[in-house]
Amino acid sequence: MGSAKSVPVTPARPPPHNKHLARVADPRSPSAGILRTPIQVESSPQPGLPAGEQLEGLKHAQDSDPRSPTLGIARTPMKTSSGDPPSPLVKQLSEVFETEDSKSNLPPEPVLPPEAPLSSELDLPLGTQLSVEEQMPPWNQTEFPSKQVFSKEEARQPTETPVASQSSDKPSRDPETPRSSGSMRNRWKPNSSKVLGRSPLTILQDDNSPGTLTLRQGKRPSPLSENVSELKEGAILGTGRLLKTGGRAWEQGQDHDKENQHFPLVES
């Protein structure tokens, strides 16, 4: 049948070795084999150190935070407020600004009402006050007469309106010029010229515009239609010699009847 010990023909391969995954504990990690930047962890403060040294170590640890995006970049130190006395220019400017602020904070001065008379006017005697009032323009006095004048003019207007309407109905004419038919005709001439203008129904023709259709443009009347009309007139009036050729009536002396000349002529 076969030997008791079976030997595979192809030698077994060793498991695949990846140099990136050699140091990884779990190769199933999604970020396996990606080299990370190592985080520098500061050592914890030792309990044997004094409190002052521990605080300094904490400050140093805060300043050199390994998680800082700008690790190792020298920063410009912040200027702390020192106790040096300010310059004289700064003192002057500060005083000016302080005075302006104090003025703006003050309440506004009370404004006197305009109707209240001034103290100087109150001190004046009655005679001087009257003289001042006389010097002032009498606005009230001028307003009352103007109102009276307007009321009088309004009263006159209704009486004048019927007279004006009567005069407007009649044509205005001078008393010197006599009224005659000739003058009336002359007066109405411009109006008649407007009426006698070109009617909108008439055809607008210019000197260059063709008045009538030429022979080429128009339809030439056929001699047959003329003969039929003449024959109708002759039959009605009973005049004219009618000829019957081939069941059709023709009039003698026509140029287009040359073909029918050999037929016998029958008088009606």
Swiss-Prot record:
A motif (KEN box) lies at residues 258-260. Residues 117-126 have a biased composition (Low complexity). Ubiquitinated and degraded by the APC/C-Cdh1 complex. Keywords: Cell cycle, Cell division, Cytoplasm, Mitosis, Phosphoprotein, Ubl conjugation, Ubl conjugation pathway. Residues 1-232, 247-268 are annotated as: Disordered. The modification Phosphothreonine is found at residues 37, 76, 202, 212. The KEN box is required for the association with the APC/C-Cdh1 complex. This is Cell division cycle-associated protein 3. It comes from Homo sapiens.
